[in-house]
Amino acid sequence: LLWRPKVRGYPPSACRLAVSFGAVLAAMNLAFYSALDRIPLGVAVTLEFVGPLGVAVAGSRRMLDLLWVAMAAAGILLLAPLGAFGGAGLDPAGVGLALLAGCFWAAYILLGGWTGRAFPGSTGLIIAMCAGAALTAPVGLASAGAGLLEAQVLLAGAAVALLSSAVPYSLELEALRRLPARVFGVLMSLEPAVAALVGFVVLGERLGWRALLAVLLVTAAAVGASRSSAAQ
């Protein structure tokens, strides 16, 4: 509704790419939120990071690149709840869904870079999100029915769509146009660290030594990966 992209004049291969990007985007979110129904948020986020870190490892060509990936992985593990992976309370289906979301995240990074280069501006993302919405709408209607059409639900859904999808995915698409996939994968490790800092500043949540060390590790990894990419 905010942007009216030009959707004609592109080769069929580019349109198929954008639709595939949208399908992966929808599957990633469905798998992740389904995992949240079964396992704690911290565990789900940690497991999902196998995706971007896997892309970073696959794209690494030097030992220094692997060092940044290892630092980011260590930081993410430090941010996971203590004992989260040692208990008997983890639902295997939830773990599997979180790992599946990570695989879709890896595909999202690769397809996002290709889509960003195949279309100008946000055109590719808009086509992808429309395709993703069309694919997920039947799932939502089957689970919630007419309740989805209530004014309160529509308003909340619009806010979530804007803040958790339209704005961040637009920014990520611009980043994917400019960065190698491996560097983007490492930079994604900043997300849980930034969340911890926001919790400290906005919500007054206390940061223990594990969280502080994790923030330092992922920040150093992000800076190191970015500088290495710029040097190349």
Residue ranges and their predicted role:
Residues 1-20, 61-67, 85-90, 116-119, ...:
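Membrane-interface interhelical linkers
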Residues 15-20, 46, 66-70, 96-99, ...:
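Hydrophobic alpha-helical transmembrane segments
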Residues 19-34, 77-78, 96-111, 138-183, ...:
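Hydrophobic alpha-helical transmembrane segments of multi-pass membrane transport proteins
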Residues 23, 50, 64-83, 130, ...:
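Hydrophobic transmembrane alpha-helices of multi-pass small-molecule transport proteins
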Residues 29-33, 37, 42, 48-49, ...:
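Glycine/small-residue-rich loop that forms an oxyanion/phosphate-binding "nest" at active or ligand-binding sites
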Residues 35, 40, 59-62, 115, ...:
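Hydrophobic/aromatic residues within transmembrane alpha-helices
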Residues 47-58, 131-135, 183, 187-202, ...:
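Alpha-helical transmembrane segments of compact multi-pass small-molecule transporters, enriched
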Residues 55-56, 74, 86-143, 157:
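Transmembrane alpha-helical segments that form core, pore/gating elements
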